[in-house]
């Protein structure tokens, strides 16, 4: 089964290169650092920020304890929550930096289905609902994907020590990592994607400036290797690798 991510009837403004009013989505594994970068980008680009609901999520902790029992309920809850946030971004017409979008929810749902944690009946119901909602959605102008390994993701999850995430397993993160790889290959045909090696945190505001410069010249999928920030000069540079489509 394919991930239902490409049916948005209202396209993003891919040709626009000014970041004023741009809708930027930040994707990545749990604990990748999406919120940290969202705050920095919002500040540097003077865009409103929209964050993922975690603490007030009514299903998340139950899901991590028993994903097979609560998988469908969680996915419907998240789909509704992110659709509401997506509509807010559209109608306020100011753009914004969004910490995880509605499109990524379909990545989680597909992964749960393939892992046997979401049966075909529930997954098909989810996909049909997603496709119906997609008629009222607008694609982001840019996706920034924070690339971290499942091991690094789990390490950061343990460091931030949220009760609702204490049952996240490495196997779950590995399956999610694989699902993201397929998602990025698909979505980059429609929305520009910047992949960032985020294995080690760097200065988020300086990285935001790099992203701004890269977006002005990019096409399809690009990659940024952030410099190592320290006392000495930096020698790394932005590496652009457009996809061969």
Swiss-Prot record:
Q: Which SUPFAM superfamilies match?
A: P-loop containing nucleoside triphosphate hydrolases
PANTHER family from the xrefs? DEOXYADENOSINE KINASE, DEOXYNUCLEOSIDE KINASE
Catalytic activity as recorded in UniProt: 2'-deoxyadenosine + ATP = dAMP + ADP + H(+)
Locate the active site. Answer: 99
- State where substrate binds: 52, 64, 75, 100, 105, 165
- List the CDD domains hit by this protein, alphabetically: dNK
What this chain does, per the entry, is described as:
Specific kinase that phosphorylates deoxyadenosine but not any other deoxyribonucleoside, as part of the deoxyribonucleotide salvage pathway.
Task: Tell me its family.
Answer: Belongs to the DCK/DGK family.
Q: What class of enzyme is it?
A: transferase
Any idea which UniProt keywords this protein has? ATP-binding, Kinase, Nucleotide-binding, Transferase
What is the taxonomic lineage of the source species? Eukaryota, Amoebozoa, Evosea, Eumycetozoa, Dictyostelia
User: Got a GO cellular component term for this one?
Assistant: cytoplasm
Positions annotated to bind ATP: 28-36
Q: Which GO terms describe its biological process?
A: nucleobase-containing compound metabolic process
**Gene name of the record:** dak
Q: Which Pfam families match?
A: dNK
> What is the E.C. number?
2.7.1.76
Gene3D superfamilies under this entry?
Answer: P-loop containing nucleotide triphosphate hydrolases
What protein does this entry describe?
Deoxyadenosine kinase
The entry lists its GO molecular-function terms as: ATP binding; deoxyadenosine kinase activity; deoxynucleoside kinase activity
Listed InterPro entries = Deoxyribonucleoside_kinase, DNK_dom, P-loop_NTPase
**Additional comment:** Can also efficiently phosphorylate medically important adenosine analogs, such as 9-beta-d-arabinofuranosyl-2-fluoroadenine (fludarabine).
């Amino acid at each position: 089964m394919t991930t239902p991510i490409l049916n948005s009837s209202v396209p993003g403004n891919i040709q626009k290169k000014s970041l004023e009013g741009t809708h930027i989505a930040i994707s990545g594994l749990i604990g990748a650092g999406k919120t940290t970068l969202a705050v920095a980008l919002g500040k540097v680009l003077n865009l409103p920020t929209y964050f993922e609901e975690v603490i007030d999520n009514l299903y998340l902790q139950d899901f991590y304890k028993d994903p097979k029992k609560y998988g469908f309920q969680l996915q419907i809850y998240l789909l509704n929550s992110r659709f509401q946030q997506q509509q807010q971004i559209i109608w306020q017409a100011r753009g914004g930096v969004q910490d995880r979008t509605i499109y990524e929810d379909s990545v989680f749902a597909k992964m749960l289905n393939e892992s046997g944690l979401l049966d075909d009946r529930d997954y098909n119901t989810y996909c049909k609902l997603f496709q119906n909602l997609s008629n009222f959605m607008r694609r982001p102008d840019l996706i920034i994907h924070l690339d971290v390994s499942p091991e690094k993701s789990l390490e950061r999850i343990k460091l931030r020590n949220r009760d609702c995430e204490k049952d996240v397993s490495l196997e779950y993160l590995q399956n999610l990592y694989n699902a993201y790889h397929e998602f990025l290959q698909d979505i980059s045909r429609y929305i520009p994607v910047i992949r960032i090696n985020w294995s080690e945190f760097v200065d988020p505001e300086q990285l935001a400036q790099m992203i701004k410069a890269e977006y002005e010249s990019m096409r399809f999928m690009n990659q940024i290797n952030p410099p190592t920030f320290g006392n000495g000069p930096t020698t790394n540079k932005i590496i652009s690798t457009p996809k061969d489509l």
